[in-house]
């Protein structure tokens, strides 16, 4: 690895794009002072991640951008690109050439790229850290760096060795773990405080919960007794509804039968066919298609469940229509019409008879009056004459006026009677119209109830499906996380620290073929057995030849990197049988249990020749007795041979076993991830169905509420019309009584008028009565008797007329009412027929939906399986090939079906039996308000027919008696007894009062608090376990740092002695730890004593000597932990020619293993350079560069020309 080129654009004085191409060896950069030589060093440090502006000889980072000159405008950005030759794979990246670019803008924004791809600063630093280039940039020795090394604190000198040894990444890992520990400490303290507080609260709350539990038991007993008493009261008032309850029971039985048929039909569901089309070869597209198909499967399943629910409702028979026959009503209407005509005819005859009777009465009364008054006229004529004509005439006029007033009142009453009659008929017609509308709304209400129940059932199924899928998804996610954690833990276990690991990381010979654990495949279950037989070879590396093995072992020895086991791939061996006959059942050859590449078969035969695998140790001993030359191993890893046995517990898992476990966990992880993706797809479809069903339920509920409001309004209107009818009938009866009273008064006044007119006529005739004729008196008696008889006939005729009028009024309009009732009944029957036909059609459609849904679900399931197989195949091939796969795209014509479900029996019974419900409404309302339970449920659960089951106390006493051996019978249910239930209720009330105040929320609070305490306790244990794991990680990292630093310090100190001797012949120098007991934080002191000098402090040495000592320390680090390249900026400026020659000798030593880039003014340094770069700056302030491959004889001419 070496620096290949450096390109600068707008960096400091390099305004124009400038590329410096480097080669292995020593590259010298020369030029006058201020020409920009050190800017090359700054550019190298900057592009490799330097973040300190002062290190780059600036005050702020923006100073690296070209600031402009008098003739050149400033630039907006600086860009440096470094190309590194990585043909030896020192950098952990699969490229032979690595390009690192850093770009900075005037606004402070920075960009980093590796091989043209954007990355982070951390990525650049981690990439370079593995080659010994860290944050401190010890490979770049700039101006002032030598003084900094000697003047720095011992702890700061330590960082140079740590960076060269690659310890900084371990320190970063340790710092990360410590930060997690700090964050975890606060959580641990918080969890401890919470669990302590919760534990303190649990004890008093448990006592309250026990009291609440006892109170709940007593309250339940009291409620049960009260409910039984209320049920007894309600049953006693529901005698008239027994038939309805019986019908409801029958319909519930039909409902259960329909549900059973639905369950049987649900098992026969399949899916509709779907068409398969070609998919693209991309795994991402296959995944999307699989996800869509899984979503469709979930949606089709939800549709099938909804269709099944609707089919269940279609199996229930509707309510029996009314028994009223419209033809009978029509016949009754015709009979009423005939009766009305007959009554009208009778009324006409009665009126004719009344007129005739009145005429006869008037004639006879006239004769009677004439006869009677003829007798009196003579007697009273004299007296009347005295009274005066004026008085009689006034009385007559007064009477006539009263008669006229009565006639007017009678006429007005007759008109009002007719108006009231007409209004009554109109209200009755409106009443019947509203009643018909109520029937229509009831039918619509039934449909809306069915629709709402369907929506609610579908939503319930959707909610259950979503909850089920969410639970399954959480379980699958936990399984995936667990498997990933297991794979990570096993992978960490594969990080070996032996010679094999060193070879895998650092040895670049092509003869290395890989780890045996990754090249072979063992039959599952036999990993421990094969690992025990192979021994160290289970963790070995495969090489292609004996020569490659020799080279690898030589590299291990030179690097002192530990030991490694190598398996030769070119080994040839014969797999001849070794006593393979007579083996017991279950014994197998080890070679039959392992699969390997053909070129590795020879080595495996050599290692496993004569090895047999059995299940148990006893079998192994038996096989060795039969064939002593065999080696026998059990599946648990116990080895048996002739005269020896090896086994036991506590064996460390081999790489072969760990690799097998990783493969097994990987397969389980792939299956779990596929299952989780399938659950995600199903959950997406289920959530869509849930939202759709929720919206449908809301819409159905709104429509049902609107219908209920309309029905209540109609019932209010019916009540108002009924009140108006009753008020009109009362008014009609009152007006009729007033008219009859006025007519009677008119008859009485008319008789008085006739009498007064007769007296007035007699006075005017002025006749005197001298004698009374006895014969005329007798005739007068006969005439008066005839008049009385005629008056009786007239009264009977008048009564007959009034009776006929009342009968006519009673039947008037009854025929029309019956006809309207017949029409309404026909309309109801027509709607029932239409509903029945609709149910038949809906049943047929439901069957079609079920069949199509089953076929569609089957085809969709096949399509999902096919897509999953394609997806798994693509995942296995790891995108190595792109193939055309067949996928399924299906189209389904959505079936829109209007399904009519069964009418709810309870609702129909309530509507059909309104009058019966009104009689018990008060008691039902009382039960609902006090207990919150429906009357039907109350009777079914607490009615007199329900026996009282034994209490928990009675059963406990029975069990205790049986345990004591007593002869007791099991408590039997007790029949209902009202007196017993009343005593039971009073006893419960008394016990509840004795308990005193009860906290009703204690049970829930205690359960919630206990659950939280258990959860927090579990979390606390998890946090403690995680803290222990982190402490183990810190301890492991400290051990690693201690080992690496100790080895590195020993190597650096050794190299420092040699380099110091080279630079200071006869002198003595060494590196010393300030605190050897604390290798993690100890500093490094530099002790130097040049020849002939005895100094105790480095500050007493000359500037050249201090520079050489600093260079000696850096070179010692370079030799102990070599880096691919080093950059030195005028490190020999303070040296004389002798010391310069010595330093150049050290450079010559470093040239063999690393690339050197030196900024220098010294001619001897230029003479040893393989490549020479000349840097110059003209008056424009812009640096220019020229290069030349140099040898010693060309240096003088180039230096002269460049000056």
UniProtKB/Swiss-Prot annotation:
Q: Which InterPro entries match?
A: P-loop_NTPase, RecF/RecN/SMC_N, SMC, SMC_hinge, SMC_hinge_sf, SMC_prok
Protein location: Cytoplasm
For ATP, which residues are the binding ones?
Answer: 32-39
Q: Which residues form a coiled coil?
A: 167-203, 250-288, 327-497, 657-689, 720-765, 976-1030
UniProt keyword annotations, A-Z: ATP-binding, Coiled coil, Cytoplasm, DNA-binding, Nucleotide-binding
Pfam families given for it? SMC_hinge (PF06470), SMC_N (PF02463)
Q: What is its main location?
A: cytoplasm
A Gene Ontology cellular-component term: cytoplasm
Q: Name the Gene Ontology molecular function terms of this record.
A: ATP binding; ATP hydrolysis activity; DNA binding
In the record, biological process GO terms are: chromosome condensation; chromosome segregation; DNA replication; sister chromatid cohesion
Top-level lineage group = Bacteria
PANTHER family per UniProt: STRUCTURAL MAINTENANCE OF CHROMOSOMES PROTEIN 3
Q: How does it assemble?
A: Homodimer.
Function, as annotated? Required for chromosome condensation and partitioning.
| Name of the protein described by the UniProt record | Chromosome partition protein Smc
Q: Which organism is it from?
A: Mycobacterium leprae (strain TN)
